[in-house]
Amino acid sequence: MSGNAYVTASPESEPAFIDEGRCAIRNWDDQETVVSFYFRAMNKGKMTVSLQAIGHSQVEVSLLGETEEVELASDTLTLVEVGTFKVKEPGYVKVDIRGKKINAGDSFGNVESLVVKGNVGPVVCVNGDFSTHFGRRGPSTHMSYTLPEGDVEWFYNEVVVPEEGDIPSSYYMACGFGEGYFGMQNNTPYPRRILFSVWSPFVTDNPAEIPDSMRVQLVRKGEQTTINDFGNEGSGGQSYMHYDWKPGERCRFLMGVRPDKNNTTVYTAYFYDNHQNKWSLVASWRRPQITTWYTHAYSFLENFNPVMGHITRKAYYCNQWARTADGKWLPVTQGRFTCDATGNQKQRLDYKGGVENNDFFLTMGGFFNDFLESGTPFTREGNVTEAPDVDFSTLE
């Protein structure tokens, strides 16, 4: 349960939640609460579904258009059969469990595992030693871009999030580079952000451990920008500004990488403020122990909240351009779709990318069926003749 189930409905006053560490449903005492298990049946056929559960209650189990009532009547974990079901087509199966009546105690009990037997396998789910935290978040998806030959200083990208893809706890990263990333987040219930981060060359998840000589140093920042350290996924310098971007809005990003003196490199990020019709400086950082131009251009889409991995996210990445060190704009039209370890290790198969209406797109999460193999290349066509209209002399 800890890696494959979500509370998909619950009263707002005292919502139930899944305790990953203890593999338990907490606050499960309201009939409004629905706990949903997800797994992928790779073949059609018949399967018997059972609950490994504890408690004294009646619960309702729904899947594949059928509903069965099951009685839990044990103080220890017991295997309780739900029924036999026909899987007509390979794909994800959602199993909803709802409490109907508490017979003893103060909750419906706990369902620790869902047991599936039959000829529909192999069954794809988060299992073994794989992280339940990252498994429940879902597979992050990436689009890596082919930069032109020679020294590239600037990478330009546009992001459009459709209404159906605008989900809380999402990072729509636009301009990744070899040493960091730059994009926008839906941080609901907090204000939406434009986020720009640069990793330190010192490898640690604790920024306090970074020696002074290996710290990323702030060069300058925008007036509305907040500066922090960051950790947990590498460490370094973080900068962000609040911007109330909307679904359907075309958000423009400009990211620069330029080698500097004394074996350092300066990274500078600008975001186009559609409300004020101007480019706004997010920040400029200096990273030690490296001399480089722009490398490894890519975008990604991720969910950073494990309780929301059952909801699909989507974003379009549009009109990519690279500007060489000698000032020439060149279109970027080739991309390669990949995903993270959650997808590569086949813990989940709800990831996809590609080209729609001559724009790259990424989608992930929500247990959809038409996944795409990691490593698939794509080429966009569309307008590759009009370079971005950026007056660099006016940038902060």
Where are these regions (language model features)?
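Extracytoplasmic
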Residues: 1-244, 252-259, 263-396
